[in-house]
Structure formats: C-alpha cells, structure tokens
C-alpha cells in the first residue's frame, strides 16, 4: 500500500512539475508575441483600411429596396428604394 501511495505521489509531483514548466514556457511565448504584436498590428491595420474604405463607399451607394412606405410621395409605386 505504501508503495502505491509513493508511486501516486511521484506521478502527481511529475505532473505538477510538467504543468509548471509548460505554464512558464507559454508565458514566455505570450510575452514575445505581445512584444511583436504592436508592430504587426500597425502594418495590418494599414492594409485593411484601404479595402474597408472601398467597401463602405459601395455600400452607401447601394440602394435598399423594400415595400413602399409613401416616403417618396408616390403612393402608387409599390417599392421604395433608399440610398
């Protein structure tokens, strides 16, 4: 019984040590990525800004058509298109 308890304690100790070492390694990796992230973020924001501006411009000019609410003062039109 004492041998199995010691074996279980040794396994538990090894698991704890492994989790501590992996946690330390992950924290180091996170620090490295956060140090590099601001530089990468500025470059990627500049690349993303151009397509987003084009997309917004197209969306604004795209008409949205729905059933007429008589906002265009043409009660017989049936469909209103707003830009």
From Swiss-Prot:
It comes from the Eukaryota. One of its GO terms (molecular function) is hormone activity. GO terms for biological process: defense response to bacterium; defense response to fungus; intracellular iron ion homeostasis; killing of cells of another organism. Residues 1-26 form the signal peptide. Residues 27-53 form a propeptide. Disulfide bonds join 65-81, 68-71, 69-77, 72-80. Keywords: Antibiotic, Antimicrobial, Cleavage on pair of basic residues, Disulfide bond, Fungicide, Hormone, Secreted, Signal. Belongs to the hepcidin family. This is Hepcidin-2. It comes from Mus musculus. The gene is Hamp2.
């Amino acid at each position: 019984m004492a041998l199995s308890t010691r074996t279980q304690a040794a396994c538990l100790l090894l698991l704890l040590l492994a989790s501590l070492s992996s946690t330390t390694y992950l924290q180091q990796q996170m620090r490295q990525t956060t140090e590099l992230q601001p530089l990468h973020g500025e470059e990627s924001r500049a690349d993303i800004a151009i397509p987003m501006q084009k997309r917004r411009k197209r969306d604004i000019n795209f008409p949205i058509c729905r059933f007429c609410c008589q906002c265009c003062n043409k009660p017989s039109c049936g469909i209103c298109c707003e830009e």
